[in-house]
Structures are given as C-alpha cells and as structure tokens.
C-alpha cells in the first residue's frame, strides 16, 4: 500500500503545486482520505516530492532560464522579500497552522481572483513578456508571494494575483510565478532539512520515494503546459470558483468534526 499511497500523493503534488488552488489543502484531503499518519517518513516523502515539482519547472522553462543573467537577477530580487519576511515571521507561523485559516484563505483567494478578473475584463495588460518585468515589479511579486506563508493561500495563487494587479498578462504572471518557485522551493526545502536533519535519515524507503518523485515530476510537467495553454484562452475565474467550493468543503469537514481543524493540518 505504501507504493500506492506514494503514487497518489505524487499525483496530488504534481496537480496542485503550480495551480492557484492550494497544494497544502489538497494534501490535507489526500492524506486524510488515505488514512496516512504523518510520521517522520511521510514528512521526508513530502519534501522529496516537492523536488520533483521543482525539477518540472526547470525542465519546462530551461530555455528561458539559460537565455541570460537578467531572469536570474529578477528571480533573486523576487525571492528576497519572501526570504527576509520568512526569517522574521517563521517562528510565529505555528499560530496559523489551523484548518479554519485554510478555509478562510481558500475562500478569500477565490473571491480575489474573481474580482480581479471582473475588474480587468477587456483591459489591455502592460506587461506582455518576462523581459518587460522590472526589478521593482519582481520585488513586489516577492512580497505577494510571502503571503503564501499563510496556510491555504497558495504560493502560485499569491504571486499570480500580484502579477495581475501589476498588469502582467495572465501568461506572464503565471510564468514568473512558476520560475520564482525555483529559488523559493529549493531554499524552503533546504531550510526544512536544516531544521530537521533527521528527515534525511528517515528517507530510507527508496521505492516509494522514487515513485512519488517521478510521479510529481511527470504530472507537474503536464499540468504546467496545460495551465499555460488554458490561461491563454480563458481567465482565472474557474480557479476562483473552485477555491471557494473547496473552502466550503473544508468548512463542512471541520464543522462536522470529520476533520480536526488543528491536528490534521500539521503535515
């Protein structure tokens, strides 16, 4: 069963990491439905499969990444506020590890996506390529991304919203969000290992780890390509509606006692 669970969680990770719908929320549902007790091995597993998602971004965007130094400088500037804010608020984040926070942020984020799209209907966007993004705008996106430290927000959702507010077109907002995930997720993963080095020692079951990693990579590649095609034709309103529905699903699960708003959240 361990290998099957690894496959399912790898699919969930690949499907949700880069869509603006909260990968954390879906991982809570997945582990709860499967009845997985998040022990040290599964903590290690969840870290490893994120690396598969990071590799997917590099695989899809490798040409853009090696076009020159400019994009790397913008990513560094974009990561800077997230890193600094993270260092200062990390010790206070435990207070937010609550299912009701997830509910609120899922619904709030969904409403924001819908309102932004309605406000920008038929509007011409000013930023239509990665090259047009200024360092100031990259820094602002990093500030928005830092909001993803609040559970249920969605890292990609927060940074995409930032891009839309700065008048990036949808594709550019999504692409910069995906690329900004590379330094953000790598450093976040390294920090998790630094805090709990014993997690690497628990990653001793190579088959499920390999299954989860490869599955997350393949699914994330497909999702990124699909998502970019989707938003070239449609807006983000469907994702906003989905977030709201998911938020109310969690509300019911927590209110009815099916899920514990405190304990089940702490992955």
From Swiss-Prot:
The chain crosses the membrane at residues 4-24, 41-61, 69-89, 96-116, 173-193, 207-227, 239-259. This is Undecaprenyl-diphosphatase. Its EC number is 3.6.1.27. GO terms for cellular component: plasma membrane. One of its GO terms (molecular function) is undecaprenyl-diphosphatase activity. It is an enzyme of class 3 (hydrolase). Bacitracin is thought to be involved in the inhibition of peptidoglycan synthesis by sequestering undecaprenyl diphosphate, thereby reducing the pool of lipid carrier available. Keywords: Antibiotic resistance, Cell inner membrane, Cell membrane, Cell shape, Cell wall biogenesis/degradation, Hydrolase, Membrane, Peptidoglycan synthesis, Transmembrane, Transmembrane helix. It is found in: Cell inner membrane. Signal peptide: none annotated. GO terms for biological process: cell wall organization; peptidoglycan biosynthetic process; regulation of cell shape; response to antibiotic. It catalyses: di-trans,octa-cis-undecaprenyl diphosphate + H2O = di-trans,octa-cis-undecaprenyl phosphate + phosphate + H(+). Catalyzes the dephosphorylation of undecaprenyl diphosphate (UPP). Confers resistance to bacitracin. Belongs to the UppP family. It is a multi-pass membrane protein. The gene is uppP.
């Amino acid at each position: 069963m361990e290998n099957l669970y690894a496959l399912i969680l790898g699919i969930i990770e690949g499907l949700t990491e880069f869509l603006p719908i909260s990968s954390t929320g879906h991982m809570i549902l997945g582990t709860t439905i499967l009845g997985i007790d998040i022990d040290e091995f599964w903590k290690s597993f969840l870290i490893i499969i994120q690396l598969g998602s990071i590799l997917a971004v590099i695989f899809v965007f490798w040409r853009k990444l090696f076009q020159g130094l400019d994009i790397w400088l913008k990513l560094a500037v974009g990561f800077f506020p997230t890193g600094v804010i993270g260092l200062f608020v990390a010790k206070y984040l435990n207070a937010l590890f609550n299912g009701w926070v997830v509910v609120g942020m899922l619904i709030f984020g969904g409403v924001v996506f819908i309102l932004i799209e309605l406000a920008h209907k038929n509007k011409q966007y000013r930023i239509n390529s990665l090259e047009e993004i200024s360092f100031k705008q990259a820094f602002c996106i990093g500030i928005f991304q830092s909001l993803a430290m609040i559970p249920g927000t969605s890292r990609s959702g927060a940074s995409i919203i930032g891009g839309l507010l700065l008048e990036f077109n949808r594709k550019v907002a999504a692409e910069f969000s995906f690329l900004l995930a590379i330094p953000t997720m790598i450093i976040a993963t390294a920090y998790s290992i630094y805090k709990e080095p014993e997690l690497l020692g628990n990653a001793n079951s190579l088959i499920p780890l390999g299954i989860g990693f490869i599955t997350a990579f393949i699914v994330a590649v497909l999702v990124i390509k699909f998502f970019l095609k989707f938003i070239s034709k449609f807006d983000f309103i469907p994702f906003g509606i989905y977030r709201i529905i998911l938020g109310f699903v969690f509300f019911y699960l927590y209110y009815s006692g099916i899920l514990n708003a405190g304990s089940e959240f702490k992955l």
